[in-house]
Regions:
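Short hydrophobic/aromatic patches at helix-to-coil boundaries
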Residues: 2, 61-64
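Alpha-helical residues within the helix-turn-helix
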Residues: 10, 21, 50
Length: 64
């Protein structure tokens, strides 16, 4: 699954560790998400989008 996590995280000057803490997951989870090696649950996608200041999950994740 493609996503804009790295791009949006960089705009906010957040490290992977800082984003992970905001979301409540391990840094490795953020790494896997950014690389597209892990498909998040709906809840995790929502939490990541919220932590990145996105209005919609679709602003961060590309489904399909």
């Amino acid at each position: 699954m493609k996503n804009r996590i790295k791009e949006l995280r960089a705009r906010l000057n957040l490290t992977q560790d800082e984003l992970a803490r905001k979301v409540g997951v391990r840094r490795e989870t953020i790494v896997f998400l950014e690389k597209g090696k892990y498909n998040p649950s709906l809840q995790l996608a929502h939490d990541v989008a919220k932590a990145l200041g996105a209005k919609r999950i679709e602003d961060v994740f590309v489904f399909g």
